[in-house]
UniProtKB/Swiss-Prot annotation:
One of its GO terms (biological process) is chromosome segregation. PROSITE patterns: CB, TYR_RECOMBINASE. Gene3D superfamilies: 1.10.150.130, Intergrase catalytic core (1.10.443.10). The keyword Cytoplasm applies. The lineage of its organism: Bacteria, Bacillati, Bacillota, Bacilli, Lactobacillales. It is found in: Cytoplasm. This is Tyrosine recombinase XerC.
Length: 301
């Protein structure tokens, strides 16, 4: 559909959204159009009104979707109709007035130090043709707090080994510098010399991307998530675990060891300090330690 193609071009060129974000937006619009087709005779997105939106919202809530999923769908459709209004294709945005009740922010899940040690033990003891790559990925993600998507886009020219800093291209093409430590430095240099260069030579690749798949082509975000899930499985950690927890763990470790909120905001690449404030929680151990230390009736008789 020409309308969707124009919106895709707008998201990609003007908004400079990532391919993953653009795909998610288009999928949400497609799902809405399918809903309209399945539930009535209205198939033209230009004719949608508030009644259609209300019916769709009821449908989403009836499916017991997570509030974050519903919010994402509404955001995509609101952006789509703003684009249509901007280009005089519709008069009003039917999603403009949709408001979801604010949900209290959930504390981010993170790995405790003991759990991180289990992850590193698992990846260092593993076998495989690209073991060094996997080690470097874990060291870089935990050592810098960068997003998985940022890690996938990393190029060697972004890394300054002498200053031990990485130039990260974040959301909205915003650049930031993040430092990295000795473990990440050694892992990257070892990987480059003993895996990356031989792989590129073997498969006759000439790009500059740091992390590669088994054909020496730039790895995808999905590829990194798969590797991390394999490491998590090998570590025998239980519970609901997601690779993004490495980023949460990085922020938590900094704050628990005395870093100020502004510094953590800069390192994570958050545009707003309020986004970073969710990390001001402390670990249970820290909470108990402070309680025992400062509350007069905390000790046993």
């Amino acid at each position: 559909m020409e309308l969707i193609s124009l919106f895709k071009q707008y998201l990609t060129v003007e908004r400079q959204y990532s391919e993953k974000t653009v795909t998610a937006y288009l999928e949400d619009i497609d799902a809405f159009q399918k809903f309209l087709t399945d539930t009535g005779d209205k198939t033209d997105l230009l004719l949608v009104d508030r009644f259609d939106v209300n019916v769709y919202m009821s449908y989403l809530f009836d499916r017991h979707l997570a509030r974050t999923s519903i919010s994402r769908k509404v955001s995509a459709l609101r952006s789509f109709y703003r684009f249509l209004v901007k280009n005089d294709l519709v008069d009003k945005n039917p999603f403009e007035l949709v408001q979801l009740k604010k949900q209290s922010d959930k504390l981010p899940h993170f790995f405790y130090e003991k759990e991180m040690n289990m992850l590193f033990e698992a990846v260092y003891q593993a076998e495989g043709a690209q073991k060094l790559r996997n080690i470097a990925i874990l060291e870089v993600l935990y050592g810098t707090g960068m997003r998985v998507s940022e890690c996938a886009a990393l190029q060697w020219s972004d890394i300054d080994f002498s200053m031990q800093t990485i130039l990260v291209l974040g959301k909205g093409n915003k650049e930031r510098y993040v430092p990295f430590g000795r473990y990440a430095k050694e892992a990257l240099q070892n990987y480059r010399k003993n895996e990356w260069e031989p792989f590129l030579s073997k498969y006759k690749q000439t790009h500059n991307f740091v992390f590669i798949n088994h054909y020496a082509k730039p790895i995808t975000t999905t590829g990194i998530e798969y590797i991390l899930n394999q490491v998590i499985t090998a570590s025998s950690l239980n519970g609901k675990i997601h690779p993004h927890m490495l980023r949460h763990s990085f922020a938590t470790a900094l704050l628990n060891n005395g870093a100020d909120l502004r510094t953590v905001q800069e390192l994570l690449g958050h545009s707003s300090l309020s986004t970073t404030q969710i990390y001001t929680h402390v670990t249970k151990e820290k909470l108990q330690e402070s309680y025992r230390k400062y509350f007069p009736r905390s000790t046993d008789a």
